[in-house]
């Protein structure tokens, strides 16, 4: 069975059984009807996914791999902050009349900085170091820029990726690992979505840097289940689990900026039914 399913189920059970409630507290999120959106939360959740063993898409319900990858490429490849560059409507709630989400997400990755090697943005710096200085302990991105928070329509949830390269004994190729730091996560709507996005990113970067994929470590400061999601989560984690799917990525792509959503697919992906009409707190 899928290791990602086990990780997800264990996390949800831990939150439901051992988490703390925000009910009655002053909280920012609210439901469409204006009422406060309370959560059951756990602090400091850490999940480890060995991408060399399986692709971490849960099978309890389907994760739309092309849609979540398109969003990741919107941020990491196009470095865009405009929803008109994205087919999905997920971000519409935070866009202004021009489609901008402000100086958030892709905008920050596209800002060029002066380095000894020249002007580069954060993504290009990561790729440069993975190719030229792979054992550096300084290969990371950070989009939680305090100076620009007042110009962001929403603060970044997943805000930092730290890459770390290892050499396995007897292997002629290096292994790419990463830590994804996330300040907050709506577990039902976003957990596996984010995990799959950054797993795909690691596969893409490993391919263009001639490395193997290793571990993705997901650190969530506030992992929460909303009050109106509790029954949905309880039903979801009781479902039948299936073997993990296999990720296919076009082996011909050698430049990160050449990838499109048509260059990947999940094979043998058997899942439970989708959960429809999930209420979303904003």
Predicted regions and their residues:
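Terminal, non-catalytic protein-protein interaction segments that mediate quaternary/complex assembly
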Residues: 1-282
